[in-house]
């Protein structure tokens, strides 16, 4: 058996739309008689289902919440995260702040960097204003391109410039290391291929 000490619910559907089952799983994972995983080592990733973020906060379980933000405003986010049309970005951030106040657990904001879309100096400044003084961690993720979607990561100097603006505003910020992109197996690149059968 390979021991493990953390769990991340991400990339297999929206966890907060399966709320009851996810919560049940979290409690089972924490059970000393089962996996005995600390709540603090469990992360739920969400695209920002506002009512469920408040609901999760009121459970007062000290798990880590990661929110796929990806934009500093509704105009850009509505393109990148279609479900955001149901929840304004300011409401998502307000829910995140409530989560922090209730659980004392700092929220992580995931932010994919896409060239000529959300990675400008103005975007970085707008992101700082959006988040305000809320304690959080910002995870910058240069997009991994695919052969079918013509979206590209910014140049490294643009990524660094974006990060530096956030750091100067006191935002703890890291850039995710890219792994597997050379074989189309990085985050966002895994896909199913259909082969035409020859008859």
Task: Please report, for each region that a protein language model flagged, where it lies by residue.
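Conserved histidine-centered catalytic loops in small-molecule metabolism enzymes
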Residues: 177
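Radical SAM enzyme core and accessory elements
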Residues: 168, 180-199
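Conserved AdoMet/S-adenosylmethionine-binding subsite of the radical SAM
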Residues: 1-169, 173
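Short alpha-helical segments used as structural interaction elements across diverse proteins
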Residues: 173-174, 188
